[in-house]
Amino acid sequence: MEKEKDSKLKQAMKGLDSFLTTHYSFRYNQITEQCEFHDKHKFDKYRVVDEREFNTLVINAIEEGVNCMDRDMRRYLGSSRIPSFHPVTAYLEHLPHWDGHDRVSELARSVSDETQWVEVFHIWMLGMVMQWSGKNRMHGNCLIPILVNPLQGLKKSTFCRSLLPPALRGYYTDDFDVTREGDALRKMRSLALINIDEFNRMEEGKLARLKNLVQMSGLSMRRPFQSSYSQQPRLSSFIGTSHFCDLLTDSSGNRRFYPVMTKGSIRLPRINYKQLYAQLRDELKHNRRYWLSPKEEQAVSLRNDAFLRRPIEESLFYSCFSLPRDEEKFQRWTIGQIYEVMKKASPETMRDVKMRAFGKHLALMGVKKLHTRYGDQYLLNRL
C-alpha cells in the first residue's frame, strides 16, 4: 500500500515537473526571496507567483491532466529545483565590453562642474557597484553624496532615481527611516539605492545613527520565522537631496557626506546604462580605487565646514561669553558651568540642547579647551 502511494506521488511530481518546465520558466529572486515565472509561449515578463498566480498554475496543471494538489505545487516551487537569480549581479554579469568613453564624469557634470565633486562622484559610483557585486565584505560604501539647492523642481530626486537602469528601478526607494532599525536593515539588504530625501530634516541623533549604518558591510538580522540572527550581505548605497545648505551637525565626523550645490535644473544626458555600468565594472576589474584616501577624506571634511548646521544656541553663547584673543587673560569653565549660565539667561533656548551635543557645539564655535585631571576646562571670558 505504501509502495503504491509512493509510486503515485512520484508520478504526480514527474507529471507536474514535465508540465511546468514545458510551459513556464521559473526563478527564485534572491533579493525579494520570491518565486517568479513567465509563460514560455507568451514571451511575457517575469512576475511573482502570488496567491492568485499560484492558484492559476494549479488549475492549469489539473486541466492538463496532471494529478496534483496545492501542496505538490507549493513543494515544487519552494524547492531547489527552481534556479536562484540575483537581479543586480545578473545585470552586471551580462554587460557588454566598455567602449572607453567616460560616461561617469559626464553624468557628474550634469549636477556640478566642481572638479572635486566629479572625482568623488566617480568614487562613489564605483563603491556602489562594488557593493552590488558582494565582493567587498570588509567595508560598506560609506560615502553619501547630497544634492543641494534651495529651489524646488530642479530634478534632484529625478537624478537620484535615474542612476539606476530601468531593469533595477524597482530596487530604489526614497522612504527610509533610521529609527526603525529592523525596517532599515531589511531595506539595506534588499535595495540597490536609497535616497534620503530632504536630508536637512534629519536630527543630530538620526545623523549619528545613519553614519553607523552606512559603514556596515554586513547586516546582523533575524529573518522572518527564525529565532536566531544571521549575517546578511548589504546591497544598498545611499544618496540624498536637500533644500538647505546647513545640514551637517558634527564638524569632526562629516567625511561620510559630500553635499554639492547643483548648478540649477539638472539636465540629465541621455544615459547609455549598459555602457555606464560596463565602465564601472571594467574600472573595478582593473583595481581602480572605490574609496576615499585619507588625504581625500581630509579635503572633504574641510570643504564640508560650509555645510555645517550652526547651533541654535550660538547667538546666546556670544551674548554670555567671549573667546580670548592671543595672550589675553582667560577664565576656565567646565561645560556644566557654561551650560548653567546660558540656561539661566534663556531657558527656552537651552531647553532642547542636550549636554552631549552641547560639547560638540562648543567645538564647532571654536572654543578651546584644556584636558586636566578634573576633566575638560574651556577657555572663555564672561561678559
Predicted regions and their residues:
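P-loop NTPase catalytic core of nucleic-acid-dependent motor ATPases
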Residues: 79-189
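Conserved AAA+/SF3 P-loop NTPase catalytic/coupling segment centered on the Walker-B
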Residues: 192-215, 248-253
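Conserved alpha/beta core segments of nucleic-acid transaction machinery
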Residues: 286-329
